[in-house]
Curated annotation (Swiss-Prot):
Catalyzes the hydrolysis of the adenine ring of phosphoribosyl-AMP. This is Phosphoribosyl-AMP cyclohydrolase. Pfam families: PRA-CH. One of its GO terms (biological process) is L-histidine biosynthetic process. It catalyses: 1-(5-phospho-beta-D-ribosyl)-5'-AMP + H2O = 1-(5-phospho-beta-D-ribosyl)-5-[(5-phospho-beta-D-ribosylamino)methylideneamino]imidazole-4-carboxamide.
Length: 150
């Protein structure tokens, strides 16, 4: 599969904001933030990062690929768990420095490595002057031990 080449972003702000060339603005580490929601119900599933190769693979294959900052490599989301993300729509923000993927999740319909549907399964609350986490979605769609051996 040929590797897409992205042109450098224009210095002209109106060129970034209008239709035409998609010229993603990667940060100084070569990454762009990807916000991922369910294409059906709009639930926020995860936030990740992409480098140019992961973004190109996502556009070309229709399957979400991301760049793992901790592992320093590209990964196809769901390759191990079976919870592949089929991309239904890709959007970018006004200055093209963030991507929004609307996806359908296969397999267990779970995105988080903890087995939950969304990585955003906790709320932050203030109790007695201290920020605390509360779990609002404890439903596990799969057992991470069975999938990842962790």
């Amino acid at each position: 599969m040929s590797h897409l080449i992205f042109n450098q972003p224009s210095e002209d702000k109106s060129a970034l904001e209008d239709a035409g060339d998609f010229t993603p603005r990667f940060d100084d580490r070569g990454l762009i933030t990807a916000i991922v929601t369910d294409a059906g119900d709009g639930e926020l599933l995860m936030v990740a990062h992409m480098n140019a190769q992961a973004l190109a693979l996502t556009i070309q294959t229709g399957t979400a690929h991301y760049f793992s900052r901790s592992r320093g490599k590209i990964w196809k989301k769901g390759e191990t768990s079976g919870n592949l993300q089929t991309v239904k729509e890709i959007r970018t923000d006004c200055d093209q420095d963030a991507i929004w993927l609307k996806v359908e999740v296969a397999g267990h319909d779970a995105t988080c490595h903890t087995g939950r549907r969304s990585c955003f399964y906790r709320t932050v609350t203030l109790r007695e002057g201290k920020p605390m986490l509360d779990i609002i979605d404890d439903e596990r769609h799969f057992d991470p031990q069975d999938i990842y051996g962790k």
